[in-house]
Amino acid sequence: MKHAKTSITDVPGPALSRRQVLRHLVGAGVVLPWAGMLPIGTGFAQSPRTSSAPAGARIGTVTNLSVEDDQFLDDVEKASFQFFWEQGSPNTGMVKDRCNLRNPNQLSAASIAATGFGLTALCIGDQRKYVPAGAALERVFATLRFLWKKLPNHRGFFFHFANSETGERMYDSEVSSVDTAILLCGLITCREHFRHPAVAELANLILNRVDWSWLAEDTSLLTHGWTPEVGFLPSRWDYYSELMMLYLLAMGATHNPLPENTWNAWKRLIFEYDGMRYIGSFAPLFVHQYSQAWFDFRNKRDKFADYFQNSMTATEVHRRFCLELNKQFPDYSEELWGITASDSQHGYVVWGGPPAMGPIDGSVVPSAAGGSLPFLPAETLRVLKTMRSKYPSSWTKYGFVNAFNPLKNWYDSDVIGIDTGIILLMAENLRT
C-alpha cells in the first residue's frame, strides 16, 4: 500500500504543530491508510493487555532500576532540564518552541506547550537540585506573573505561539485548547510542588479564568481552538488522543466546568495488531504519552479501559511494528526503534504506526522511546542507552536531538521543547 505522505515542507509558515498538521491533512482530503482499525465500540470489559495480549508479551518488565540505569536517567533529565532553563526567558518564563543547536541564541517563538513542560521541569530541577536553591521558584514566580498579567488570552485560553519577551501573538496562531491544557498541567504541578501561598494564589487565578464551557460551544466536546479571524476551529476533541488531560481539567474546574458525562462523549476506537487489542487514534505514539505525563492512570479504570495498560499495549505494538520494518531499515532492532511526530531530513513529519503513517525512511525519534519509559521500562531504556553509546551525535547538551537517521547519517540540528519535555517528565515518572 502506498503510504500517505505527511511531510509539511510545502505548507507555508513555521507555526504548524503536529495537531495543526493533522488538521491540514484532513482538510486537504489526504487519505490515511488506517487498515487494521476495528469499528467504533463502547469499550471492552477487560483492559487491552489482559484481554488480548498474547502469552509471553513482554510488557512492563522492570520494577526496580539499577544504580547504573538510575544514573543514566539522571543524566538524561539533567541535560533535558537545561533546555528549559536556558531557552526559557528569565523575565517571562516563556520557553522557546525549539532551539537550533548550531545557533542556540537565535530568535524563536515561545510556545505555551513548551512553557507548560518548562513549569514542570522547574519542579524537577528544584527537587533534583539541578539549579541553586530558590532559583526555580523565582522563575516560577516570573512565569506565573506574566501569565496572569501580560500574556494575551481569550476566555482564559492562550495563543499557541507568542513572543517570548512581549507575549505578542505570533504566526496568527490559534487560541489552543490542548496547548493551554499542557500549560495548566505545568501550573498545577508547580502549585502542588512548591506549596507556596503566592504560587497557589496566582495559579488559581489563572486556572479559574479558563472558560471551558465557552470552548465547548454548549456541547460536551471541546473544539481544538479559536482565532479572532475565523472563530472556532471546526475540529473537535471527539476521539481518543491526548485529550484525556483536557477533559479531566475541564470536568474538575472550579469555574465554568464541563459536566461529568463529557468523559463518555468521545469515541474510543479499537485497533488490533499481532493479536493485541487497544484503544488507538488517528495519530502517532505521542497521543499515548502526554496525558499520562501528569495524570497517574495506574491501577485505575473506567467502564471502557485501564488507560495505563492501554498505553503499555500501544507502545508494545509500536515496538513490534518497528521491528517488522527491519528488512527495509536494517538499523531498526530491539536496540533501536521508535517513530512519532518529529523533524526529518526534509521537514516536519507526522509519522508512526501501525498502521504505517507518513513516508517512514529509517529515522528514529528519541521521544518515542523516551516518552514511553513508564510503559516499557526495559525496552525503552535499552533504546535510549543505545542511542547515546552507539550514536553519539544524537546526544547534545540538551539531551537527545529531536530525530536522526542512521541510514543516511543525518542528525537533526534542532531540539523541540515538547519532545524534550516528554522525555524529561517520563524519566522522572519512571524513577519516582
Task: List the predicted regions and their residue ranges.
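Hydrophobic alpha-helical segments
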Residues: V31-L32, M37, H193, R301
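Compositionally biased non-globular segments, especially hydrophobic aliphatic-rich helices
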Residues: S7-T9, P48, A53-G56
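Signal peptide processing junction and immediate N-terminal pro/mature segment
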Residues: M37-S52
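N-terminal secretory signal peptides
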Residues: M1-Q20, G27-P33, T42-F44
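Ser/Thr/Asn(+Pro)-rich, low-complexity disordered segments
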Residues: L22, P54-T432
